[in-house]
């Protein structure tokens, strides 16, 4: 067993879908890669989930997720903030843009919709299922919901 000193290393997964035909238009190669994106939820994933205090309040950054997003951007991945807040874009988007800028992230796209170009979603509420089965990929998520 190896002893660890200092902070534990951050695991950053690189999406595996580069070049696959996952776009709405079934594009291949670089054209497909330019459309593909990683979705990152805001509250509870990129920012700490605080009790609702209105659109202007966004929790403190979650350090590990901030690092992941910055690495993905450096590697050339397209990252979007996928948040339910964006259902009211006039109220939601300006404070999110300000929060991103304040915490060193670029002007990312902000949406509340996913499409076939999304290759991954990072969210505190997701349960991944085996396609066409309804069965969870990993262990039963219920213990984590309590």
Report residues per predicted region.
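Catalytic phosphate/metal-binding cores of nucleic-acid and nucleotide-processing enzymes, i.e., regions
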Residues: 2-146
């Amino acid at each position: 067993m190896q002893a660890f000193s200092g902070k534990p290393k951050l695991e950053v997964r690189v999406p595996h879908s580069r070049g696959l035909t996952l776009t709405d238009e079934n594009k291949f190669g670089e054209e497909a890669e330019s459309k593909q994106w990683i979705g990152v939820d805001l509250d509870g994933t990129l920012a700490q989930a605080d009790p609702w205090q209105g659109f202007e309040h966004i929790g403190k950054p979650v350090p590990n997720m901030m690092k992941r997003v910055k690495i993905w951007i450096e590697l050339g991945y397209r990252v979007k903030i996928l948040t339910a807040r964006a259902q009211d874009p006039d109220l939601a988007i300006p404070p999110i843009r300000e929060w991103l800028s304040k915490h060193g992230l670029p002007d990312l796209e902000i949406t509340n919709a996913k499409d076939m170009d999304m290759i991954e979603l990072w969210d505190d509420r997701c349960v991944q299922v085996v396609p066409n089965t309804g069965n969870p990929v990993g262990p039963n998520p219920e213990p984590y919901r309590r």
